[in-house]
């Protein structure tokens, strides 16, 4: 049975590949799990049209992500004020959510906490300057300095 793969499947092929598999494997596993569809002329045309649309959306998302990275790189650094005690230790900590909120406010781009890559995968607990990586899109990263200052009450 000839099918079109809708997902990457080990030892079978990559997304979009036309492969021949046993009919039971296709009918009982691949097609019900939406991992493949029958390779009819109509389905091939539909799949190719969807692929073209997805490629154009991916190119648009890539250019938007590059613009976002350039904007964040132009910022250079952001400042976050927090209450601290003796020797610069913070009362609490600064996490990825706080940094994402500050970057979103400064740049205008919606940055989520999952895009923030903190050093040592930990929260920031002392006053100082930290270099933070931001994962914007597939292979597009941006770097920004986060300056944590003492909040004077």
UniProtKB/Swiss-Prot annotation:
The keyword Transferase does not apply. GO terms for biological process: translation. Keywords: Ribonucleoprotein, Ribosomal protein, RNA-binding, rRNA-binding. GO terms for cellular component: ribonucleoprotein complex; ribosome. It holds the Pfam family Ribosomal_L9_N. It comes from the Bacteria. GO terms for molecular function: rRNA binding; structural constituent of ribosome. Gene3D superfamilies: Ribosomal protein L9, C-terminal domain, Ribosomal protein L9, N-terminal domain. The keyword Protein biosynthesis does not apply. Binds to the 23S rRNA. NCBIfam families: L9. Belongs to the bacterial ribosomal protein bL9 family. This is Large ribosomal subunit protein bL9.
């Amino acid at each position: 049975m000839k099918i079109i793969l809708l997902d990457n499947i080990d030892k079978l092929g990559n997304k979009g590949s036309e492969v021949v598999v046993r009919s039971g494997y296709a009918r009982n596993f691949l097609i019900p799990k939406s991992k493949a569809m029958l390779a009819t002329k109509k389905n091939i045309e539909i799949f190719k049209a969807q692929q073209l649309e997805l490629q154009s959306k991916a190119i648009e998302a890539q250019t938007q992500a590059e613009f976002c990275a350039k904007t964040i790189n132009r910022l250079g650094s952001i400042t976050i004020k927090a209450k601290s005690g003796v020797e610069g230790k913070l009362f609490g900590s600064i996490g990825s959510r706080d940094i994402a909120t500050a970057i979103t406010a400064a740049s205008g781009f919606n940055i989520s906490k999952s895009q923030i890559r903190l050093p040592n995968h930990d929260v920031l607990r002392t006053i100082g300057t930290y270099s933070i990586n931001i994962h914007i899109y597939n292979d597009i990263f941006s770097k920004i300095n986060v300056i944590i200052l003492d909040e004077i009450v």
